[in-house]
Amino acid sequence: MPKNSSTTVSSAVEAHAGGLASGPGGARSGERDRIVVQGAREHNLKDVDVSFPRDAMVVFTGLSGSGKSSLAFDTIFAEGQRRYVESLSSYARMFLGRVDKPDVDFIEGLSPAVSIDQKSTNRNPRSTVGTITEIYDYMRLLWARVGVPHCPQCGEPVSRQTPQQIVDQLEELPERTRFQVLAPVVRGRKGEFVDLFRDLSTQGFAVVDGETVQLSDPPVLKKQVKHTIAVVVDRLAMKEGIRQRLTDSVETALKLADGLVVAEFVDVEPVAEKGKKNTAEFGGRDAEGNPRYRSFSEKLSCPNGHEQTVDEIEPRSFSFNNPFGACPECTGIGSRLQVDPDLVVANDELSLREGAVVPWSLGKSTSDYWLRVLGGLGKEMGFSLDTPWKDLTEAERDAVLHGKDFKVEVTFRNRFGRERRYTTGFEGVIPYVMRKHGETESDGARERYESFMREIPCPACHGARLNPTVLNVLVGGLSIADATRLPMREAMEFFSGLRLTDRERQIADQVLKEILARLAFLLDVGLEYLNLERPAGTLSGGEAQRIRLATQIGSGLVGVLYVLDEPSIGLHQRDNRRLIETLLRLRDLGNTLIVVEHDEDTIAEADWIVDIGPRAGEYGGEVVHSGSLADLKANTRSVTGDYLSGRRSIAVPERRRVPEKGRVLTVRGAQENNLKDVSVQVPLGVLTAVTGVSGSGKSTLINEILYKVLANRLNGAKLVPGRHRSVEGLEHLDKVVHVDQSPIGRTPRSNPATYTGVFDAIRKLFAETPEAKVRGYQQGRFSFNIKGGRCEACAGDGTLKIEMNFLPDVYVPCEVCHGARYNRETLEVTYKGKNIAEVLDMPIEEAADFFSAYTRISRYLDTLVDVGLGYVRLGQPATTLSGGEAQRVKLAAELQKRSNGRTIYVLDEPTTGLHFDDIRKLLHVLQSLVDKGNTVLTIEHNLDVIKSADHVIDLGPEGGSGGGTIVATGTPEEVARAAESHTGRFLAELLA
């Protein structure tokens, strides 16, 4: 997989920077219209020489693990990036990521390079589809310039207030009300404001960040801190006869503060919110709810006199990353963590003494303390600590969860056996968890407390992220939050159909053009079902990649080398055509595209095809074909050519399994996201494919509803399923297994051997060798995670990090163990001539042959080979595995577990990253699971898998609001006859 996880732009010079070796005799090809690679040896590449045309769409294909990504990303793109970085100053390089020099003799014809891979854009909860495409930035500008503010209280459009109207409102204050007339010249801006203080030096007093100061002796402000400065224009007490003075003061303040004036009621003492100090705006109320400040605007205010004044609308007002626009409750996140009682009390059969309250049962000292406190509460309320939680009264359970406002008497014996008593308040377990979560500085403790919480929409903004004032600024009748919730196609219709006045049209014309152009690109890559408020962290790898692709098209760059990693992942066949047209448009602008791809349609449209093989891993790394599609089909050495020409194929099953009558799962009334009260039956004991165009509701139905219900009921999980009425038929199942594409580990110490458990058996075998027995070595000696057998110089990592100050950190092999991870004594123990480090470095297929005599080991390894991972090294770090590889490692691990035929396996696009031949192997594994009586339920777009299924559930007919219904169910042949099914149309062609 590519090393660079984000869209990276790098310039690469035509000449060979860094003194790369030339070809034989120093000759150069001199071909300006081609990219030439000579002597590529990265990873499993075997001294590869290849050339292909520029300004063309070039597809790199081949079996999974054959070396496609090693050539495309780790060699060609990496060299382009390295040349660009080396052209920068050492100071600039300090801020860039580490760039490895690929193992290649030379590359010629490189252009500035852009890598667009499948890694998610980022996990920042503040990033959305709108922000990463920059559409939201243009929307903020549009709403700020032509939006019509409305009063949050009455909904009326706000209007401007005259000085006379402001004075009239102030005169309604009670007699003898003392207040100051302030001119807010600075509101929540960073700076020292030295010049401003100099200009105001004769104005008397000012309120600076809540403190009254003399302007003749102003404070020194911190430049990087936001400040609020208001000139004190007048101090008044409301009484008869001050109208003229009040009018003069208001007019003076309005002039000083550009149309703003604030009345500060000096007798109101605001109640400070714990831990917060807000100096960015005028706020605060006393215990009775009376405001300390009241703002007035000469520009915008409510016609009905509601005291909440709308400030001047600016683009920053619509940013949920800015305190002026963000919802004050959730600070712009749109959600908040809340303790869930169901997670706090995991088992209501237990009593308090038995640990029903999980947060108070973590460790003996914690448990003993809270049992004493709960004992005091029990005495006060009359319940026993031995009563099961479910048998406590509602009031008693509520007291334990939420606390009581009275004191409880706690009795305990000290270490001398003497009885002691004291009284204490009882805050309850939910306030306790919330308090500890807010106070802790430990990441581990924070994660522990968050395990008792669920994320819920913010109750103040209902997930809109913005404050009420901003949410009442409307364009075309919609707030900016409402507009971000529209699916892309509806958003396109909304913005293109906006009715604006001539003046508004003149202001908004250019902004609307930018918004519509970006929306059009997103539609072109098949993302019409997404909306702009969708968090970036929830996007699949394919969706994130296509968003970046759309952004690049919008940039209009020419002469660029784009390197893409399977852009068709997650796309239905219907949407694939539009994606290919988008790629061709990018090429026609004058760019070169290298597309790592298995999709047959994309390969067919390529200008040039490079097939890497002939097999995977150690048996690949060669260029099997470089040229046209016709020549590839004729190449009998190419496995890809065999499938494209029809010499090999994945056959339609001779017979399909017939579901046993009555043995079904039934989901009723599914209504989450775009599902429209869907009810569907999932037959058990068969292979079922869930299909439909992107955004039709497949993942919502299976992952968000069905799987979570099954996990809760069968596995004892505490997940929150999507909205539905019921799920029936669970009595037919004992276990659910969810095999997704999340990593098998987040450190290099995790690998296929450790995840599947085969490493335990291998270590045990090494411990049983004669040499190990003589030395007294136990199984733990062969672990690189604990002291004893590992190399202590690198703590079992095999590498050492060298800090280079202004240069990136360099990772070098450990000088003691030379990357083997183990010490010399451990490596002296061998089995069949191989030590433990050499075994971990074997491809899994080779290791399976090596350990063939030991069934316990070979059974694990054969399963990994069966799922198409024979090329992966046994000890390959988890961080280097792709999502598809990680998913297949998990599948192999599950295949090792004994099954009674009552297990349902839920998979989400298991064919991701797989070649035709690998899909054939995967299907064999899935069919073998079903042959044992289990159920396999897979979300899938791949037609070879769909045609091999026993049962198909097709959702649609479209994505987003146009989907969410069941279009067809039945065998692939029955779905192929469904007129409304897009999947059926493609199946019909395949089954004909």
Curated annotation (Swiss-Prot):
<dbReference type="Pfam" id="PF17755">
    <property type="entry name" value="UvrA_DNA-bind"/>
</dbReference>
<feature type="zinc finger region" description="C4-type; atypical">
    <location>
        <begin position="302"/>
        <end position="330"/>
    </location>
</feature>
<feature type="compositionally biased region" description="Polar residues">
    <location>
        <begin position="1"/>
        <end position="11"/>
    </location>
</feature>
<keyword id="KW-0547">Nucleotide-binding</keyword>
<keyword id="KW-0479">Metal-binding</keyword>
<comment type="function">
    <text>The UvrABC repair system catalyzes the recognition and processing of DNA lesions. UvrA is an ATPase and a DNA-binding protein. A damage recognition complex composed of 2 UvrA and 2 UvrB subunits scans DNA for abnormalities. When the presence of a lesion has been verified by UvrB, the UvrA molecules dissociate.</text>
</comment>
<dbReference type="InterPro" id="IPR041102">
    <property type="entry name" value="UvrA_inter"/>
</dbReference>
<feature type="binding site">
    <location>
        <begin position="62"/>
        <end position="69"/>
    </location>
    <ligand>
        <name>ATP</name>
    </ligand>
</feature>
<dbReference type="InterPro" id="IPR003439">
    <property type="entry name" value="ABC_transporter-like_ATP-bd"/>
</dbReference>
<dbReference type="InterPro" id="IPR041552">
    <property type="entry name" value="UvrA_DNA-bd"/>
</dbReference>
<keyword id="KW-0227">DNA damage</keyword>
<dbReference type="GO" id="GO:0009432">
    <property type="term" value="P:SOS response"/>
</dbReference>
<dbReference type="GO" id="GO:0003677">
    <property type="term" value="F:DNA binding"/>
</dbReference>
<comment type="subunit">
    <text>Forms a heterotetramer with UvrB during the search for lesions.</text>
</comment>
<keyword id="KW-0742">SOS response</keyword>
<dbReference type="GO" id="GO:0009381">
    <property type="term" value="F:excinuclease ABC activity"/>
</dbReference>
<feature type="zinc finger region" description="C4-type">
    <location>
        <begin position="791"/>
        <end position="817"/>
    </location>
</feature>
<dbReference type="GO" id="GO:0006289">
    <property type="term" value="P:nucleotide-excision repair"/>
</dbReference>
<dbReference type="InterPro" id="IPR013815">
    <property type="entry name" value="ATP_grasp_subdomain_1"/>
</dbReference>
<protein>
    <recommendedName>
        <fullName>UvrABC system protein A</fullName>
    </recommendedName>
</protein>
<dbReference type="InterPro" id="IPR004602">
    <property type="entry name" value="UvrA"/>
</dbReference>
<dbReference type="GO" id="GO:0008270">
    <property type="term" value="F:zinc ion binding"/>
</dbReference>
<dbReference type="GO" id="GO:0009380">
    <property type="term" value="C:excinuclease repair complex"/>
</dbReference>
<keyword id="KW-0238">DNA-binding</keyword>
<dbReference type="InterPro" id="IPR003593">
    <property type="entry name" value="AAA+_ATPase"/>
</dbReference>
<feature type="domain" description="ABC transporter 2">
    <location>
        <begin position="659"/>
        <end position="988"/>
    </location>
</feature>
<keyword id="KW-0862">Zinc</keyword>
<feature type="binding site">
    <location>
        <begin position="692"/>
        <end position="699"/>
    </location>
    <ligand>
        <name>ATP</name>
    </ligand>
</feature>
<dbReference type="InterPro" id="IPR027417">
    <property type="entry name" value="P-loop_NTPase"/>
</dbReference>
<keyword id="KW-0067">ATP-binding</keyword>
<dbReference type="Pfam" id="PF17760">
    <property type="entry name" value="UvrA_inter"/>
</dbReference>
<keyword id="KW-0863">Zinc-finger</keyword>
<comment type="similarity">
    <text>Belongs to the ABC transporter superfamily. UvrA family.</text>
</comment>
<keyword id="KW-0963">Cytoplasm</keyword>
<keyword id="KW-0234">DNA repair</keyword>
<feature type="region of interest" description="Disordered">
    <location>
        <begin position="1"/>
        <end position="30"/>
    </location>
</feature>
<keyword id="KW-0677">Repeat</keyword>
<dbReference type="InterPro" id="IPR017871">
    <property type="entry name" value="ABC_transporter-like_CS"/>
</dbReference>
<keyword id="KW-0228">DNA excision</keyword>
<dbReference type="GO" id="GO:0005737">
    <property type="term" value="C:cytoplasm"/>
</dbReference>
<dbReference type="GO" id="GO:0005524">
    <property type="term" value="F:ATP binding"/>
</dbReference>
<keyword id="KW-0267">Excision nuclease</keyword>
